[in-house]
Amino acid sequence: MKENFWSTLPRPFFILAPMEDVTNIVFRHVVSEAARPDVFFTEFTNTESYCHPEGIHSVRGRLTFSDDEQPMVAHIWGDKPEQFREMSIGLADMGFKGIDLNMGCPVANVAKKGKGSGLILRPETAAEIIQASKAGGLPVSVKTRLGYYDIDEWRDWLKHVFEQDIANLSIHLRTRKEMSKVDAHWELIEAIKTLRDEIAPNTLLTINGDIPDRQTGLELANKYGIDGIMIGRGIFHNPFAFEKEPREHSSKELLGLLRLHLSLFEKYDKDEARHFKSLRRFFKIYVRGIRGASELRHQLMNTQSIAEARELLDTFEARMDARSEV
């Protein structure tokens, strides 16, 4: 195995969860500017597309990263071990420091095809995929859920994954059936930690689900002795979720992050064409808690270009400044 970066991380370490159409190079750099986590994962990249002669072009943007983001982990999904083997070798050549295997995606057209969380129902295939992914020499980690249908599945499933000799296991504390409709099952953390200690004490344990910020993560780590904390949806409510010394942030700071997001989108669009509409999901992160926020979000959602969005921000901030001077 190449250098196992996981062993060099602080305890507890913090990870920005991989999220489809979210954790691309643009948003990762915005989060870095606000408050950087210890580890970044890419958005989801499909092994079949990567291994297809034509498909590689469709996933190229998903695997784009810069040196200042290291350690960078490629988050990949599929169900054919030979494709994971091929991709693991390619990812090592690209400079990634690790590979994370998606065994938790609950989306129907993924799970019902035996991929993502569907692999919970295919434990032998999951094991083959994990072993095949070690071919490139990078440390292999897994992100999964407690089970597919029922919480009671967690012990047999997680025991099986722990037995595969992986670097890190990130557990979203819900089942596939639960999606994100119920509270994460924090009450199981202690038992999961005990199982890890018995089966695979050298595998790091990362917890995910309903963790809004670094402070909450530290409390969980101190209480249960887990190694890592993964924050996902919490970043939508607070882009400063990873900051070590939390403080109040002004609307100017939030709008400044939006301007940075626009600039980075423009910068990386030159390397890999990106649809402007993909920006719209991010506006609510930055435009909040200020007079006129709802109207500004509505206007931004109707923009068609970076220039239009910037013009709206210029006008809005000019009005803000004028009101503050009165």
UniProtKB/Swiss-Prot annotation:
Annotated EC: 1.3.1.-
Binding sites annotated in the UniProt record for FMN: 18-20, 143, 208-210, 232-233
UniProt cofactor(s): FMN
Key words, A-Z: Flavoprotein, FMN, NADP, Oxidoreductase, RNA-binding, tRNA processing, tRNA-binding
Enzyme class: oxidoreductase
Matches recorded under CDD domains: DUS_like_FMN
One Pfam entry name: Dus
GO molecular function: flavin adenine dinucleotide binding; tRNA binding; tRNA dihydrouridine synthase activity
Nucleotide-binding as UniProt keyword: no
Annotated InterPro entries: Aldolase_TIM (IPR013785), DUS-like_FMN-bd (IPR035587), DUS_fam (IPR001269), tRNA-dHydroUridine_Synthase_C (IPR024036), tRNA_hU_synthase_CS (IPR018517)
Gene3D superfamilies: Aldolase class I (3.20.20.70), Putative flavin oxidoreducatase, domain 2 (1.10.1200.80)
Key word NADP present: yes
PROSITE patterns associated with the record: UPF0034 (PS01136)
Entry annotation: catalytic residues: 105
Catalytic activity: a 5,6-dihydrouridine in tRNA + NAD(+) = a uridine in tRNA + NADH + H(+); a 5,6-dihydrouridine in tRNA + NADP(+) = a uridine in tRNA + NADPH + H(+)
UniProt family annotation: Belongs to the Dus family.
Role of this protein: Catalyzes the synthesis of 5,6-dihydrouridine (D), a modified base found in the D-loop of most tRNAs, via the reduction of the C5-C6 double bond in target uridines.
Name by which UniProt lists this protein: Probable tRNA-dihydrouridine synthase
Organism annotation: Staphylococcus epidermidis (strain ATCC 12228 / FDA PCI 1200)
Gene label: dus
